[in-house]
A protein has these predicted regions:
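Middle-to-C-terminal accessory/interaction subdomains
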Residues: 1, 6-168
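Single conserved hydrophobic/aromatic residue that forms the stacking wall/gate
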Residues: 166-176
Length: 176
């Protein structure tokens, strides 16, 4: 995909071996699912891909992080990092899932497996209905807004241009 992977600690040997194993095996059947489940924390990967798509995080290619303990039987896990290009109004109707399937080698391998696709759909639906339910998110945003509102003035004094990005609601409340 033209993206260089940076190793912060350890090496890519185990990761590349996992990709090679999945690429070399027919992973779309039941045995493929057993192989997938033995190598990765499936829920961790689904959460990572789902949030990337849900947030329309256009910088996903160079903002992926994963890790695995160096012990027998450990599985690959994923982290959510750097969503600075996520939840951007200009990308609100953008579908990144096609891009992820096309350019994210591991995801493109996994979607060949029916069990993975079903788990992905079920976990994504659960996130939409629970984790990202509108009232739940509104309550979280409101509670965080109350915590940080006293810092808005200091932030604007230091980074005055960011005030241009504020909503009219914030301006109406005297924050800009």
């Amino acid at each position: 995909s033209g993206v260089d992977l940076l190793v912060v600690e350890g090496d890519l040997i185990d990761y590349n071996a996992m990709i090679n194993i999945m690429s070399a095996n027919y992973i779309s059947d039941t045995n493929g699912w057993i192989l997938i489940d033995s190598l990765i924390n499936v829920n961790s990967f689904i959460d990572h891909v789902f949030l990337t798509g849900y947030a329309a995080n256009t910088s996903w290619e160079h903002n992926r992080e994963w890790w695995k303990e160096k012990s027998a039987g450990s599985k690959w896990q994923w982290l959510i990092v750097d969503l600075d290009r996520g939840f951007n109004y200009s990308n609100i109707f953008r579908n990144l899932f096609d891009n992820l399937i096309e350019d994210y080698e591991l995801f493109s391998l996994l979607v060949e497996n029916q069990v993975f696709k079903q788990k992905f759909a079920q976990r994504s639906a659960a996130h939409l209905n629970n984790t990202f339910a509108p009232m739940r998110i509104q309550n979280i945003v409101d509670s965080l807004s109350n915590v940080i509102s006293s810092e808005i003035t200091n932030h604007i004094e230091r980074w005055s241009e960011s005030c241009l990005l504020y909503t009219s609601d914030a301006a109406d409340e005297g924050h800009c």
